[in-house]
Structures are given as structure tokens and as C-alpha cells.
């Protein structure tokens, strides 16, 4: 009975979405055409193949659920490189229309938008059913949590844009339609940044959690705006800023688009900027045996070595710059540790370590105290704590 209720609820949500004004306007379908895709018995059976969810959903499996309706919509127009690649490109163009039209657009686009609505529904149920995974999931702030933040209104609109522009579906599609794993990197950055931000907030440091969350989740969206032949590592910052600015989110954009290690050089960075750069530094990607990207969250020391191993034409000047970045992030991490922030991601606040009485301190204790106190004073001054 519970499964039957879930299926009926899921079907009702899908029907409401596909006959709503937003979908009809985007797809160019009439309400009658959309309703013709929603045979109740057919879709209750289809949804019953995936609900209740017990494992990670594959975009390819959802495609098979939708294929008959999609092919009916597309008619003789079929994507040259297959549906998943086409839908991935369609979703990228929702964020970045300047990528331009493709020959298959038209009825194929309506089919892709239909698929995206079904995928969104299934992924919503996946999030409800499965344990949180920092490589896949985003623990966005609830309205109650962000209502007191300075950037509450921008964050509310960011969450709306994230959902309406199918950004999470785009990230999941990228896992299967490309050899890249942008999802796990972005999700990992968001996880690290928010764990640290919450710890700082609990310790009394003024930090805008909404600003950190929006910037961390959106910091690499510009990768989807890069055109063939463009150098993604250099230009994605520009396209990230372009998307946020176009959506009217300038404050989040300023943090999200300025997350390179070079942005650490100005002395007075906001705590939100430091958190994003720190989290991005720790979430690193490597190639697995099959050539696909694998993302892991490393400690600062390991991340620094990985970065050095990937640098081209490392001269003394470039090495000094990265050593400076590493040292500054290390000071920031030490400062967070001194406040009990869970930088090791154990899920529990770290105990604040107290030094022995002055008369009992060893030379090691004293030198460590001086270094930590110096970093603490510097960050407290910079962050106006």
C-alpha cells in the first residue's frame, strides 16, 4: 500500500509539472500534447520500475523509461550522438544560450525537456531515500536557516534557479555523458566549505552561510559555458560570473567567480572567499584506470603535492606563489582548528586544545602557541572577529 501511495503521489507531481505553464512555454507543447504523454496506467508501471529507490539512479535508466514518449515527440528527428549527449547539451544551453542551436533542436528539444522533468522527479525521490553522500548530494540551507543571512534573498533566488534550470540534472548527466566528474568536485567543495562555515559560525565568527553555500555550489558552473577549443581552466571563472550576473546574483557571483589560488594574494579577503578557496584546494580530481575523473577530498598537504605534480613549466616564481598559497591556507586551517572547527570532516566538532600553564610549557608548546596566536590574530583582524 505504501508503494502504491508513493507511485500515485509521484505520478501526480509529474502530471502537475508537465501540464504547468512553465514547462509548456519552454517546450512549445500544448496542454493537450503534454497530457497525451501522461497515460496514468503506463506511467504508474514505469515509475514502479524505479520506486521505491534502493540504489543510485542512472540517467540512462531513466532515459529508457522516457524513450517511447521522447521518440514520439521527436518523430524523425533523432540526435546524432545519442539522447544522453544531446540532453546534456540541451541542459548546458539552458544556462548558456550563447552556446547556440544545434541541427536537432526543435522537437528533439521538447523531448529533452520532457526527460529532464522525469529525471528531476526521480532524483528528488532518490534524495529522500538514500543516505547523504558528499560526492553526490548538496545539503542546502533550509529557509529557516538562511532567513537570517545577509544574502538571504540572493540565496533564495539561487536555489530557485538551481532547480528551474535543471542544474543538478546537468551535473548528474555529465557523469554519464562525459568522462568528467564535475558533480563530485562541486559537491565535495560544497561539503567542505559548509562544514567549515558552520564550525566557524558556531565559534562566533560572523560568516554568511547562504553566501558560502551559493558560491560553493555554483563556483564551477562556468565550465558548462565554455565553447569547444576554449581553455576551461582559465575561462570558466568568466562564464561563472556571466551566469550569476545574468541571473541577478552579483554578491554570490563575486565570491563564486574569484576562487582561484591567485585570488588569495589580496590581504583582506572575506571569510566566505577564504572558505571557498580552501574547500576548492582540498577537492581534487585525478584520472582513474578507465580514464574517467575521480574526485577525492584530501588534506592540505596532499592537495599541495597533487597541485605541484600537475603544474606546467614550474619555475621558482610559480613555486613561490603556490608555497605562499599553501602557507596561507595552512594558517587559516590552524585558525579554524583553534576554534574547534571540524576540518577533518569527522562529523563532530573538534575539541579546542588548551595549552599547559606557561610555567609547564615546553619549547615546542611555546613555539606552536606563538605561531597559532599570530595566525589567529591575523585572521581575527582580517575577518573582523
Regions found by a protein language model. Give the residues of each.
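Short alpha-helical hairpin
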Residues: 152-171
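A short, surface-exposed helix-loop junction/capping segment
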Residues: 169-175, 218-222
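Short, surface-exposed acidic
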Residues: 252-253, 316
